[in-house]
Amino acid sequence: MIASHKPNVPSGGSSFLDGQLLIAMPTMRDEQFARTLVYLCAHSAEGAMGIVVNQPASHIDFTDLLVQLDVIPSSERILLPKSAGAVKVLRGGPVETGRGFVLHSADYFVENSTLPIDDGICLTATLDILKAIAGGRGPRSAVLALGYAGWAPGQLETEIQANGWLNCPADSDLIFGEGVDTKYNHALRKLGVDPGMLSSEAGHA
């Protein structure tokens, strides 16, 4: 489920949207992305890869996953640091849903395993970070996503032009904050958009 190497993602560039949040618009045709926020981990001419940050994985607890993956024995569950219990498990997207990706603050970094993205946010997809979290040596902030969202070359640009997405700068609260159910409206308000008045008019930030 968790890989042993650095995630394979498209290499980005200055003209792309790495580190931005995508906000699904009412015109989004794919129902699995309705009212989603997607943090773009990589975006280039080769395509794009992102993590949905506002869809909880129902009935999945982070501490249960640590036991299932043999990171800790079941008997040590009660010994986990409080920070481990606070890690949310999200549905990161429809691609490779059996694989885990940890978005986290930049205070945790492992060479050849951690991908720095932007503004102090990184991506790691190895068991080492789960062991670090379980041992109280992990990042200050983290979420575990199961699966990811992927786009072929030019696909995301086409969806944005078709008014499928708005984009806005990401911040730690929108990624790691407590209110998963309120993140969508929070992101819209960050752009000065009233969620109650949201229309299908084209445009992006």
Swiss-Prot record:
InterPro entries according to UniProt: AlgH-like
GO CC terms of this entry: cytosol
One Pfam family per UniProt: DUF179
Matching HAMAP family: UPF0301
NCBIfam families: PRK00228.1-4 (NF001268)
Family of the protein in this entry: Belongs to the UPF0301 (AlgH) family.
Protein name as it appears in the record: UPF0301 protein Xaut_2594
